[in-house]
Amino acid sequence: VDGFRFDLAATLARQFQEVDKLSAFFDIVEQDPIISRVKLIAEPWDLGSGGYQVGGFPSSWSEWNGRYRDTVRDFWRSQPSTLPEFASRLMGSSDLYQVNGRRPVASVNFITAHDGFTMNDLVSYNEKHNEANGEGNRDGESNNRSWNCGVEGPTNIPDVNDLRQRQMRNMFATLLFSQGIPMICGGDEVARTQQGNNNAYCQDNEI
């Protein structure tokens, strides 16, 4: 083990309910002779007020770059006004990290993760399909920035399947050529699907 990834890491910085970038937790980490020398990766947000802290962690940390994910998804589904921000994400997101002198390695670039759509589902579904979770399709994120390429779900239409394959190649190429640390969700490289389920933590099956 050469590092740790902290889920909902903004919670660790909360003191008196507010996110404090100078919190005691960060001081303890910086002073520890072992932990201060390993890779530290933050999911830099939580569910509380002011919890979205992308770009706000100390220089020794790398962060999941949620802005990268959203911008790349929007760009490849041809959303307007994304080109300038897409260029920033491609070049290491200096607008987020240069304030305190951080380099592109501060940015963990990703398009998909264990939460949400797989890459295949991102180009195959406009809407989540979480009915199998037993919550009336109310669970999971509704704004997925996805595009089904013209047909919802699996199809035998060659042009649609070709477009989906091209879209996945576009996103993979963007991820691998961007400055920063690329993160690929396991299974995306073989077009794994969760059949449109973007909250499949409770599915102990092929999904």
Name each model feature, range by range:
Residues 21, 25-186, 201-203:
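Conserved alpha/beta catalytic core and glycan-binding cleft of carbohydrate-active enzymes
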